[in-house]
Design a protein with these regions (language model features):
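Alpha-helical transmembrane segments of multi-pass membrane proteins predominantly involved
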Residues: 1-329
Length: 329
């Protein structure tokens, strides 16, 4: 559905503008020809933006996410949660900055300010809705689905901050997606191993996991703390860069809302950690075996999440800044 919206919007945009390059579309939007064809062109652009909204699971285009995350096979869910979202954010940033540059003025109005405000509103809605609804979830995959919606909201803060410091904002988005990829893959790896052994994805059935398999419990804890933004996990640094970008773009109110949402999110992440380490279970005497290759995969990913939040922060962020500068050189 989302791909259909994107393709339909792009085909309409080509039909109305005769342009296939992003810079050519930007030139058309600033020309006299656009004023004669404004309504259909804006409709095509709206379809494209809505398509991106579905791709990144931003509210109010999120309604497919919880059901798909819960119903799809867990490996498929893991792929959708990281690869699709990261690629879609990369395309969204490229599209917005190329088609709506800061120099573009339509009817005396800087068009960039419009999508900056739109990104801010969508960020607030996505963060708040995702975190509040996640509080009542009983299925771990469904919880991570609403968490994914909230994560899209955090990332949209970086999109909103693009107007002020393009390179550092793109770097913040890139770092966050890089962190999110490792963190979410770690969480879903634990879910795959747990569900295969127990046949359950209920949060309550995670009770006593620290005694049934300490490695699985530790890996899930690191993943959840990273998603919650707790140091030294990578999520803390990722959120810091996004909040910093928002503050530097004079979006202080947006940054404050982001911090408040991060506190709410930390609560339901810690509830899961509490269940794994504190709650008792009748199945505590039934260990969950994990083969050696999976142990190595979990260990390497845990180390990667920690290193991304400590010694690898500067190298990865500097690489992202250089990449952002080269993207529009």
């Amino acid at each position: 559905f989302a791909s259909g919206l994107l393709l339909y919007g792009l085909s309409l945009l080509y039909g109305f503008t005769g342009q296939t390059s992003l810079t050519g579309i930007a030139t058309y939007l600033g020309s006299e020809a656009f004023s004669l064809n404004a309504v259909p062109v804006l409709a095509a652009l709206t379809l494209i933006i809505v398509g991106f909204g579905f791709k990144i699971s931003a509210a109010p285009f999120h309604f497919w996410t919880p059901d798909v995350y819960e119903g799809a096979p867990t490996p498929v869910t893991a792929f959708l949660s990281v690869a699709s979202k990261a690629a879609s954010f990369a395309l969204l940033v490229r599209f917005l900055l190329a088609v709506f540059p800061s120099t573009l003025v339509i009817n005396g109005q800087e068009i960039q300010s419009f999508w900056v405000n739109l990104a801010s509103v969508l960020a607030i809605i996505s963060m708040t809705l995702g975190n509040l609804v996640a509080l009542g979830q009983k299925n771990i995959k469904r919880l991570l689905a609403y968490s994914s919606i909230a994560q899209a909201g955090y990332t949209l803060m970086g999109v909103a901050a693009l107007q002020a410091h393009t390179d550092t904002s793109i770097a913040a988005i890139t770092f966050y997606m890089f962190m999110y990829t490792f963190t979410n893959l770690l969480a879903f790896a634990v879910i795959v191993l747990f569900s295969e052994a127990t046949g359950s994805e209920k949060i309550s059935d995670l009770a006593g996991l620290s005694r049934r398999n300490p490695m699985l419990a530790l890996a899930m804890t690191v993943a959840l703390l990273s998603l919650g933004g707790v140091p030294p996990a990578a999520g803390f640094v990722g959120k810091f860069f996004l909040f910093q970008a928002a503050v530097e773009a004079n979006l202080v109110g947006l940054a404050i809302i982001g911090v408040l949402n991060a506190i709410v999110a930390l609560y339901y992440y810690l509830v899961v950690v509490k269940i794994m380490y504190v709650d008792r279970s009748e199945d505590e005497d039934k260990p969950i075996p994990v083969s050696r290759p999976y142990v190595w995969v979990l260990a390497i990913t845990v180390i990667a999440v920690i290193l991304l939040g400590t010694v690898l922060v500067s190298p990865i962020f500097d690489w992202a800044v250089r990449g952002a500068a080269g993207l529009f050189a």
